[in-house]
Amino acid sequence: MSYQQKFRLDGERAVVTGGGRAIGLCCTEALAEAGAAVVVIERSEADAEQALALRNRGYDVEVRVGDVTDAARMDAIATELADGGRPATILVNNAGIGQSGIPAQDLTDADWLRMMDVNLNGVFWCSRAFGRSMISMKRGAIVNLGSMSGTICNRPQPQTAYNVSKAAVHHLTRSLAAEWAHHGIRVNAVAPTYIETPMVVAVEANRERIPLWLADTPMARMGTPEEVASAVLFLASGAASLMTGAIVNVDAGFTCW
């Protein structure tokens, strides 16, 4: 097999949570372009419109409506795919929410629990649901969306709940990688820097923060969703066949300083 062919995903079936927008949409596009059939999980059909539009380019993209915090729904989708004869061989746990600017002492119980439910529980529910069929097949690749915030403490904005949720995702990644390696399943994560997404740009306070972020970044720029998706594609592909338990920084050098 040529080196270029190692990046191909022909015959694979990928599931991308939150795959209809921003980073998730780019992951959907990257995997589909590499030859995978992609199932996007979004909370509504409307959220998946851009992903479905990829069909116009000849890509195999389907949508399932569901919330990653609903473990039973994730189990049902995984079972449906497996019973239909095309179980997921790739899972990208992309769905997540952000939170910044709230001091720890002002976080409500609801703020904290919501962050953990989406960013951590959702990753585990999906990994467990789709991992079962991967275990049966003795192969699979899971890529989690972590964050550099799982390693460092951001400034100037306080974001304790988000940071903790992503640190937990990183260790969940390592734990599943160690436990499932003998099943032929690789589990890795990407840890992006600040990315130009609607979630980041829409926060008015970030207009003052961005110059400070860039001053803390060796490459002096934010990332793009496409750059994150490229790393996800690599980890999902055979080109990363010896990698498991890795947390890959896609951070413009932010964590170097």
Curated annotation (Swiss-Prot):
Its EC number is 1.1.1.16. The active site is at Y162 (proton acceptor). Optimum pH is 9.5. Keywords: Carbohydrate metabolism, NAD, Oxidoreductase. Its cofactor is Mg(2+). NAD(+) binds at R21, A22, I23, D67, V68, N94, Y162, K166. Binds one Mg(2+) per dimer. Can also use other divalent cations. Optimum temperature is 35 degrees Celsius. Gene3D superfamilies: NAD(P)-binding Rossmann-like Domain. Catalyzes the oxidation of galactitol to D-tagatose. Also catalyzes the oxidation of a wide range of substrates, including polyvalent aliphatic alcohols and polyols, to the corresponding ketones and ketoses. Galactitol is the preferred substrate. Belongs to the short-chain dehydrogenases/reductases (SDR) family. This is Galactitol 2-dehydrogenase. It comes from Rhizobium johnstonii (strain DSM 114642 / LMG 32736 / 3841).
